Amino acid sequence: MPTVKQLIRNARQPIRNARKTAALKGCPQRRGTCARVYNPKKPNSALRKVARVRLTSGFEITAYIPGIGHNLQEHSVVLVRGGRVKDLPGVRYRIIRGTLDAVAVKNRQQGRLQYGVKKPKK
């Protein structure tokens, strides 16, 4: 327990919470270029795809590619948002479908917003 004199000399510092998406530098999204597109190693290899993305903020991150099927390859320009994937350790970002080089998911009827699909014509 510090003395009153010690507290006057240097006040208590508030505990700062660490950001979960440091690579975005406080922005809601960041643009980046795919360095490599691959499947995660065993035991998470299932049918999931991830990409190493070099962001405009200078970070190189691992981002999840949501939805069924994608057109991403090396040098594709993508938009990245925060949001972790529970069963893939170290994957704390997601690629936004339907923007830049990442096309929307085909034949998607429900939950379209997450996958960049426009409202179908009646």
Curated annotation (Swiss-Prot):
Main location: plastid
Protein origin, superkingdom: Eukaryota
Keyword Cell cycle: no
UniProt cross-references to InterPro entries, sorted A to Z: NA-bd_OB-fold, Ribosomal_uS12, Ribosomal_uS12_bac
GO cellular component term, pick one: chloroplast
Record's subcellular location: Plastid, Chloroplast
This protein's record includes keyword rRNA-binding: yes
PROSITE patterns listed in its UniProt record: RIBOSOMAL_S12
Disulfide bonds: none
Any GO BP annotation: translation
CDD domains in UniProt: Ribosomal_S12
Keywords assigned: Chloroplast, Plastid, Ribonucleoprotein, Ribosomal protein, RNA-binding, rRNA-binding
PANTHER family named among the record's database cross-references: 30S RIBOSOMAL PROTEIN S12 FAMILY MEMBER
Subunit structure: Part of the 30S ribosomal subunit.
HAMAP family: Ribosomal_uS12_B
Task performed by this protein: With S4 and S5 plays an important role in translational accuracy. Located at the interface of the 30S and 50S subunits.
Family assignment from sequence similarity: Belongs to the universal ribosomal protein uS12 family.
The protein's name in its UniProt record: Small ribosomal subunit protein uS12cz/uS12cy
Protein species of origin: Triticum aestivum
Encoding gene (name): rps12-A
